[in-house]
Amino acid sequence: MKQLIQTILKTGPLFLVIAFMVLSGCQQQKPDPSQEQKPILDKGIAIWNNGNLDEVGEVWDESVVRSVNQLPDVKGVEGMKKVISGFRTAYPDAKLTANEVIFAENKAILRWTFTGTNTGSGEMPPTGKKIKIWGITILHFANGKISREIVAYNNQALIEQLGFAMIPPKGSK
């Protein structure tokens, strides 16, 4: 009996270590969200950079909603096509760069830089000026596509780089 107790005491810690390793190794690992989301994000950035509007529906969901600063929401694939086309018209050499991306389950946060030369017509007359702005975008994914896009950037920095100025209202001191 004494020998049995000694054997159990000697092998007990080893048994506990093996049991712990087996049980913790059996836990199902969560998939890395970047595996699915990064190719979608990369293709979206490529579309912004090359202007291939035929591929927009491969990246953005039909019911996508895009919110930017305080502007009205853009909805659907056709809305995304108009936004991308508008930027590509105003800035024919537009380049969107992902500086940092954080992937999470069904979401990604993107810190980006946008550069281009304002030689095309858009909401404002072309100025011929080069711009460089950065912003943050929160992307939501569903069914392998972007379903929601929330964008924030400093619009005043953009306006100033284009050569426009903020004029205070009359009567302000």
Write out the residue ranges for each language-model feature:
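C-terminal and inter-domain tail/linker signature
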Residues: L4-I5, P13, L23-K173
